Amino acid sequence: MINPEYLSRIKHVFFFISLCLFALVLHGQKIYYTTENAHSHNDYEQKIPYWMAYDQGFGSIEADIFLRDSELIVAHDEKELEFNRSFRTLYLENIDSCLNKNGGNPYKNTTRNLQLLIDIKTDSIATLAKLIVLLEQFPVLIHNRHISIVITGNRPNPDSFSHYPDFIWFDGVLSRPYTPDQLSRIKMLSDDFKHYSQWLVDGQIPIEDIEKLKSRIAKAHQDGIRVRLWNAPDFNNAWAQLIKLRVDYINTDHIAALAQYLQTNHFEYISPGR
């Protein structure tokens, strides 16, 4: 008869070996750029706001908001305010419906995350205060590890980032230094591509500009923060070069084209962390 204590030890050994093998398999698996790395720039200008990007599985969607008569209106500039597009209706209610449909997840694929980038066009303090009151009406949305609410545009002083609720994150500026406390509330670092480089006629980024960009992006990744470059060229060759630079979110106005590009090309992706 086999000693029970011996059997127990054997089980523990096999369990440990299994864990090691599982870890090795995970370590050997490559992750690739997908539409979770795609950002729908000025999404409200799409033919069907929110849903066009969502249906392609985009990981980040952008809405610009104005505070007008105690309401949050989606618009690019004051001329568009006459369209009276409600931020609540276009984005919060649609995201909430997806969460309810998918058991608390934004997507049916439960590993997928969604970032809502909110570009504040009016006074940062007053608009953020109104936004927080509105967001608190959607508890499933704000208390969700798969959803990130990130503030860009007119932002409060970084020293006050920690004064805001935990469900509010901020978009930092890639070229700007931040303290560790400030970085702890920054979800993404963005910048204007043209601050770093001008696209050459042959469709390439100058080598000296590449090194400058790589250095900035590497520093952000060391801090565990993802990067987005806006105002960059928006076509296949440009996307490929942004990916080579390890930009995490590819900014686009062309949702279907970028989705197809990422689905038919396999570029290895290394996540910086949060």
Give each language-model segment a name.
Residues M1-Y33:
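Bacterial Sec-dependent N-terminal signal peptides
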